[in-house]
């Protein structure tokens, strides 16, 4: 372990000695005027696109009391890709699973009968 530590210290010393001294970089100076644009007021909040026309976007509504975190910038509906299935969908799913299990069982029986010798 001492050999590894000594090798590491020697390598760092050698690397530091081989690098020429450079003057420190000049200090950062803040710009005289702000470089950004202020946000437009709420009624003229636009969504930008590659097309030359602009479409106004609706403003966000106030969040309800039990909500947490950010309410989001716009009030568009969020698509739900996975929802809770209704009772009919669950019954169809169970029927399909049952039919698949029955077909698999019948295939197994058919192969067992074909394999028997009389």
Swiss-Prot record:
Family: Belongs to the vitelline membrane family.
Signal peptide: 1-17
Organism: Drosophila mauritiana (Fruit fly)
Protein name: Vitelline membrane protein Vm32E
A Pfam family per the record: Vitelline_membr
Subcellular location: Secreted
GO biological process, one term: vitelline membrane formation involved in chorion-containing eggshell formation
Keywords on record: Secreted, Signal
MF terms (GO), sorted A to Z: structural constituent of vitelline membrane
Cytoplasm as UniProt keyword: no
PROSITE patterns according to UniProt: VM (PS51137)
Family annotation (InterPro entries): Vitelline_membr_Cys-rich-dom (IPR013135)
Job description of the protein: Major early eggshell protein.
Stretches assigned to the VM domain: 36-75
GO cellular component, one term: extracellular space
């Amino acid at each position: 372990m001492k050999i590894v530590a000594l090798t590491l210290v020697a390598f760092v010393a050698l690397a530091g000695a081989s690098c020429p001294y450079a003057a420190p970089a000049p200090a950062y100076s803040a710009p005289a005027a702000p470089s950004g644009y202020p946000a437009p007021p709420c009624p003229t909040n636009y969504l930008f696109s590659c097309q030359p026309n602009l479409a106004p976007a609706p403003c966000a509504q106030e969040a309800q009391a039990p909500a947490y975190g950010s309410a989001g910038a716009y009030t568009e509906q969020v698509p739900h890709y996975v929802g809770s299935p209704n009772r009919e969908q669950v019954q169809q799913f169970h029927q399909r699973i049952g039919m698949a299990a029955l077909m698999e069982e019948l295939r197994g029986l058919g192969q067992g009968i074909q394999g028997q010798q009389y």
